[in-house]
Amino acid sequence: MRKIRLYIAISLDGWIAKPDGDVAWLDQIPTPEGEDYGYAEFYAGIDTTLMGFNTYREVLGFGIPFPYPDKTNYVFTRQTDQADTEHVKFITADPATFLRELRIGPGADIWLIGGGQLNSALLQHDLIDEMWVFVMPIVLGHGIPLFAPPLPEKQLTLLHHQTYPSGVTLLKYEPRS
């Protein structure tokens, strides 16, 4: 079965973006030359991405070509008038139902890009198999949370942790059985 893997950056106080969805604060984090925080290896292990519509709009606002053209990309939305694009399939179905089917199909692992609402929906339905959470050395004060409330209590098992010279800390978890 394919794994759904959350790979995401958060501020020390738990925000994935500013209230307006802006993630430019990530550019303030020093990244030593040649350090990709495991991204290349992670990206090579997935063939599908998942994101909510607000996250998709933020990605389009980066002013670069769509960054995942070599993957199958699903964007979850409540807007039924969205037409699929060259790189994106819009999904209006219930995320949990859709992803239960997708996981049992052929393919590599699946990257849950976010945002907070989709992260929360998948967590509530036990559909996140791994969480790669990169804690950035910055306090934002307010913003969009990693998981939108309400949330059930979930116990996690720490699989790996790593602190980088930049102050970024990776916490890799899986749900406790």
Residues covered by each model-derived region:
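Enzymes that bind and transform nitrogen-containing heteroaromatic metabolites
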Residues: 1-177
